[in-house]
Amino acid sequence: MEEFQRHIELDRSWQHNFLYPLIFQEYIYAFAYDHGLNKSILLENSGNSKYSLLLVKRLITRMYQQNHLILSANDSNQNVILGHKHKKNLYSQMITEGFAVIVEVPFSLLLISSLGEKEIVKSHNLRSIHSIFPFLEDKLLHLNYVLDILITYPAHLEILVQTLRYWVKDASSLHLLRFFLYEYRNLNSLITPKELISFLKKRNQRLFLFLYNLHVCEYESLFVFLCNQSSYLRPTSFGALIERIYFCGKLKYLVKVFTKDFGVILWIFREPFPHYVRYQGKSILASKGTSLLMHKWKYYLIYFGQCHFSVWSQPKRLYINRLSNHSLDFMGFLSRVRLNSSVIRSQMLKNSFLIENISKKFDTVVPIIPLVGSLAKAKFCNVLGHPISKSVWTDLSDSDILDRFGRICRNISHYYSGSSRKKSLYRIKYILRLSCARTLSRKHKSTVRAFLKRLGSEFLEEFFTEEEKALSLILPRDSSISRGLYRGRIWYLDIICIHNLANDE
């Protein structure tokens, strides 16, 4: 980021929020391909059209020419960009990838300036996503209902442009973004919003992630603000909160007259806001209120999406579940609140009593079926979970194969270290371990049994001992606390994203 700031010469352009001139800078395309500012890498790959510096120079030169952008979106077969029909897709891809870097500039500079004003970075800026689970463990034990919410992509592309307009004042950049979005849509007049999102993901993942994160940020900021100010909302905007007209009057009346008989109703009015947690596009609302209260929030969210983002969600797509008999699928874990009963014998004088205590426990379980499906999709096993060789890796060296399998196994083990039950995690490790052995034996044209017999029992030992090695650096091996942690749940403070296999769709 420091190199990025040093090489971006905004000066007067940034003072007026002009980002469009950056599209004519060569280093922008170097950033788009994750090569930093090392132009020699581009020169070394001059035979590859995607990384050719010559093509970047040619693209910029022709953009400077008059009538540089000639593109008809009505007929994709006749489209011509920059006067070269056969290079239309290549040049269009280069411009969109460079533009994805450019639109991140205002947010990057704002982040740098905000961090520069503070000597110490606040802890919430460095918070691990694993910190969500201790929060859920602390809160969900006292709640009753949970509402699963999926923040969908807006059907109207203009909403994305309008959202970015609050941050970027450069009209040329906004017009260029609008041009790209409508070009994708006009490639097929019958394309649906869902197909458009899938196409945009494949065409330019960086631009898609930026726009989607910006949309989610806008959604969440408005939602939290309106929830905090819900008592001041006008009923014409949100039909679900029409009773807010008489909210204060009803509350005073209930407090004065029905305090003794309607304590539950009073509690609903006094504490209407549930706990809210979000990761990426999925969020949950949990409350200790009644089912009626959760249904109110459900229809409030539907009206909120319709009024602000033109997202027409079906009520059946928002699920209200009771925590006592429902598993919550969130961030790659299956979480639930389990009831534990224990019987205690108590004796008073000559009489003995059996006292049954019921306590709640927050369980986080590894979803074995989705994980095995992800491993099968990645060609580590078949659909039944039987390990197979990774044939595309047989051309690599033995050390590279071991390093790749070991890294995947360590990442999965690291992420699912907070699981209440480790048996499913051991099965995943077994699949990866045997898949690695099959891959190496296939490379050396040998059987798995002969290959393992030749290498000995220490082969791939790190697949199962990585977590123990990490803990042994912190606690003595023979301590009772250490032995408990090997079997218990561990939440780490350095995890910033879900592992790909856990987040696979």
Curated annotation (Swiss-Prot):
The family this protein is said to belong to: Belongs to the intron maturase 2 family. MatK subfamily.
Cell location: Plastid, Chloroplast
BP-aspect Gene Ontology terms: mRNA processing; RNA splicing; tRNA processing
Keywords, alphabetical: Chloroplast, mRNA processing, Plastid, RNA-binding, tRNA processing
PANTHER family xref list: MATURASE K (PTHR34811:SF1)
Protein name per Swiss-Prot or TrEMBL: Maturase K
Primary subcellular site in the record, as a coarse category: plastid
Keyword Plastid: yes
Gene Ontology CC terms: chloroplast
Origin species: Spinacia oleracea (Spinach)
